[in-house]
Amino acid sequence: KAKVYLFDDNLTKKFGNRSNQRLKNIQEIPKIKFDSIIVSPGIDVLKCKLSKFLKKNKSKIYTDLDVFYSFYKNKSITITGTNGKSTTAKILHEVLSDQMYDCRLVGNIGNPILCEKKITNNTFFVVEASSYQLDYSQLFTSKFSAILNISPDHIERHRNLKNYISAKFRLLDSQSRESI
């Protein structure tokens, strides 16, 4: 049975004064032995309040994309790039939906990938993936992937263009020969 804990920089603001053994403050987190750590894409592991702890446990960090992939292997088309991700993902979603596919548009586009419901064996996903989501991903791969373009962006997060490009290309790192 898994033990799941939640942390937020401002527990009181998010959860009030409710006492809950699953909510942990910043002093408690480093004392817990974790098998896996799922980090929200918006969290900069190198700059957040838990950066020292997260750097030490980097091999245990997974993303929302990794959790998704563990349930829905080979059920997605993933689009990334600096510009045009949303437009391309929307057009692709419309084309597939017009062909009567049960297709969901998820990811960085504003529809959280882990919030989809009523998923069947015929459900297919068009995923817009940001460099933030791909940066710490360890498991995620997509049946079909596209990197549209790359130009300097989010350097404040990735620190340099090489790291930004590396985050984008993580999408292709674990693709099989059968993937496109």
Show which residues each predicted segment covers.
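NAD(P)-binding Rossmann-fold cofactor-contacting core
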Residues: 2-16
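Conserved beta-strand segments of alpha/beta enzyme cores
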Residues: 3, 20-22, 60, 102
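Glycine/alanine-rich phosphate-binding loops at beta-alpha junctions
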Residues: 5, 25-29, 38
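Structural motif
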Residues: 7-10, 39-43
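Short linear motifs in intrinsically disordered/low-complexity regions
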Residues: 9-10, 18-21, 58
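A diffuse structural propensity rather than consistent per-protein peaks
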Residues: 12, 25-27, 63
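Glycine-rich, highly charged phosphate/nucleotide-binding loops
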Residues: 16-32
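Phosphate-binding loop of NTP-binding sites
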Residues: 29-35, 41, 45-179
